[in-house]
Regions:
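Hydrophobic/aromatic residues within well-ordered alpha-helical segments
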Residues: 47, 54, 58, 62, ...
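Short, charged helix-capping/linker segments at alpha-helix termini
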Residues: 22-23, 130-138
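Helix-turn-helix
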Residues: 7, 11-49, 53
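Amphipathic alpha-helical packing segments from all-alpha helical-bundle domains
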Residues: 73, 77, 106-131, 142, ...
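Amphipathic C-terminal alpha-helical segment
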Residues: 85, 145-163, 174-181
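Hydrophobic alpha-helical connector segments
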Residues: 53, 64-91, 141-144
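Solvent-exposed, charged/polar functional surfaces in cytosolic regulatory/catalytic domains
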Residues: 57, 61, 65, 81, ...
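Amphipathic alpha-helical segments used for helix-helix packing
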Residues: 86-114
Length: 181
């Protein structure tokens, strides 16, 4: 069976999401995608090499097919996608990788993790900056991500998705009530 790069990256994302960086193994990934471990290493020389690809894919999915001509609707849609993903999957692959693969032993992964979150913030901010200004847009986007990511605590420890719904609602209310330029 010949596994596509996309299928390898998607399966790696699920392993990272559910087992963290340290708990995910190249052998487990090879087994999941139907490859020998040696074949997997010809495509990705290290586990760390998968991290940027996993995070790029995740952000590409979040920002895919946004409504044109309505940046506020696009902003809301991305936040809804983040909230839905975190509620359904329970764990954020970005946070798992931030805790497990962002130290001096994994410098490329650390750069990718930082880029994942700052990239989300900056792309969200770019959507709303024409309406609220660059500084305020960056604050709103950063706060929204922090709220949504923080709400995963209650999804994980109590199975309660209501804090996620409130975090989304508060983030959308905040942008709606921010004075326009």
């Amino acid at each position: 069976m010949k596994a596509s790069l996309g299928s390898i990256v998607r399966e790696a994302r699920e392993l990272f999401r559910h087992h963290g960086y340290d708990g995910a193994s190249m052998q487990d990934l090879a087994t999941k995608v139907g490859l020998k471990k040696a074949s997997l290493y010809t495509r990705f020389p290290t586990k760390e090499a998968l991290v940027p690809e996993v995070l790029i894919l995740t952000n590409e999915e979040l920002f895919a097919e946004l409504p044109e001509g309505d940046p506020l609707a696009a902003y809301a849609l991305v936040l809804e996608r983040i909230a839905r993903g975190l509620s359904q999957e329970i764990r954020c692959v970005g946070l798992h990788l931030a805790y497990g693969a962002s130290g001096p032993d994994t410098p490329d992964a650390a750069v990718a993790v930082r880029g994942f979150f700052t990239g989300q913030r900056d792309r969200l901010a770019a959507l709303i900056a024409p309406s609220v200004g660059e500084v305020r847009a960056r604050e709103l986007a950063g706060d929204a991500i922090a709220r949504l990511e923080g709400a995963t605590v209650w999804t994980v420890v109590e199975g309660d998705v209501e804090p996620m719904a409130r975090a989304l609602r508060l983030s959308l209310e905040e942008i709606a009530s921010t004075p326009r330029r």
